[in-house]
Amino acid sequence: MRKPTALIILDGFGLREETYGNAVAQAKKPNFDGYWNKFPHTTLTACGEAVGLPEGQMGNSEVGHLNIGAGRIVYQSLTRVNVAIREGEFDKNETFQSAIKSVKEKGTALHLFGLLSDGGVHSHMNHMFALLRLAAKEGVEKVYIHAFLDGRDVGPKTAQSYIDATNEVIKETGVGQFATISGRYYSMDRDKRWDRVEKCYRAMVNGEGPTYKSAEECVEDSYANGIYDEFVLPSVIVNEDNTPVATINDDDAVIFYNFRPDRAIQIARVFTNEDFREFDRGEKVPHIPEFVCMTHFSETVDGYVAFKPMNLDNTLGEVVAQAGLKQLRIAETEKYPHVTFFFSGGREAEFPGEERILINSPKVATYDLKPEMSIYEVTDALVNEIENDKHDVIILNFANCDMVGHSGMMEPTIKAVEATDECLGKVVEAILAKDGVALITADHGNADEELTSDGEPMTAHTTNPVPFIVTKNDVELREGGILGDIAPXMLTLLGVEQPKEMTGKTIIK
């Protein structure tokens, strides 16, 4: 008989004292409450820097499963760059230094591309400010800014405040000038609408497009015509004599400071790929030997990468496989990628001895119409696997508290919590009957806050702590744990040595 060690992830099940708008607290959940009272338990931090996000930012399912499976804090791109700036590593980055060396030796210009806002989804203007300060420190004289206006991840008419903030840094450092301005609708298309990207390219390379004496004038004129940040036409900033402040020329260098790839790929390809055929670039196609992308955008972009992908070696799944143990990953459609791809550190392939079970999520418009989703089918399939003694390690996700929680509707979400509790009982009972151990936790909160203080639906995730219960009475748990500490604790229970790459600390004392 196998004694399974199961990790049960109650997606979106956070803990909060206040019962108002709290579907987790208001639901009848005798199984969870019983385990909480009977077995060793604690809470874990599932948001902010504890999961590699900026301080105070709510967690999400992708990040949660990545951290849990990796057994360490997996820094997301925004935080990774922030930490590099804070710790002084940013200025030493080899790709930045190489681009700077190139323009200084050749007497050419450094161009900074990117989304100018503090939205933090595709970019952060603080990263561009760090580049301006670096250029000033290294004595680069010609630095030009090609600002992509946001209006989508931030308010629709906020560009002026970001231009003002940039001008402050230009004043402070003595380097940098705006060269072109364009709305992200043009510069950051991802749907192969190449006519939009072409307008942007022609402004940057040929100085073609509406001309303005300043970035401020460009924005004011656009607003006067009812065109707001996202949709500002690619425009050229000109000197007093109406010549462009700068265009992109041979041997110039570019640093593209967006860190999220999807909307950066197309415009990057126009500049980096010699075989580019999506539109005719015209006679002037500048040769850019140093085109630096903040992160790895795509195999289709021939540029240098400042922050290379982090290889997550020795995730929980890999370590379990190396120990010769059999593992099962099981979830319904909505969370299947999370218990497989994300849990395995961004790996699609199965490990040796890994089995996967996918149960289809119900075909309904929104899950508040069917709060139980496919939880009973998932549970039946899993209990059957446990009874057949097939696996040493089980990774299970129950999707309901998150997927129904996104509706912001109390009644359906309470039903989702209650269905989750019912099935949690069945699974834990089956595990205990085999003398196994269950670790019950969540990846982030959601169902714990369904209403705002005004009584409006709250559809987002929360920053509340998540539970951690071990159904074994002879263990002691420490306080202050994070999601990255779960895998080390599981390895402790399995009697498998924790690899050095796994920097989380076991929650089991």
Swiss-Prot record:
Residues recorded as bearing Phosphotyrosine in the entry: Y35
Keyword annotations from UniProtKB, A to Z: Glycolysis, Isomerase, Manganese, Metal-binding, Phosphoprotein, Sporulation
Catalytic activity: (2R)-2-phosphoglycerate = (2R)-3-phosphoglycerate
Transmembrane segments: none
EC number: 5.4.2.12
Cofactor detail note: Binds 2 manganese ions per subunit.
GO CC annotations, alphabetized: cytosol
Record-level GO BP terms: glucose catabolic process; glycolytic process; sporulation resulting in formation of a cellular spore
Ligand binding (Mn(2+) 2): D11, S61, D443, H444
Task of the protein: Essential for rapid growth and for sporulation. Catalyzes the interconversion of 2-phosphoglycerate and 3-phosphoglycerate.
UniProt cross-references to PANTHER family, sorted A to Z: 2,3-BISPHOSPHOGLYCERATE-INDEPENDENT PHOSPHOGLYCERATE MUTASE
Protein's UniProt name: 2,3-bisphosphoglycerate-independent phosphoglycerate mutase
Organism: Bacillus cereus (strain ATCC 10987 / NRS 248)
Organism phylogeny: Bacteria, Bacillati, Bacillota, Bacilli, Bacillales
This protein's encoding gene: gpmI
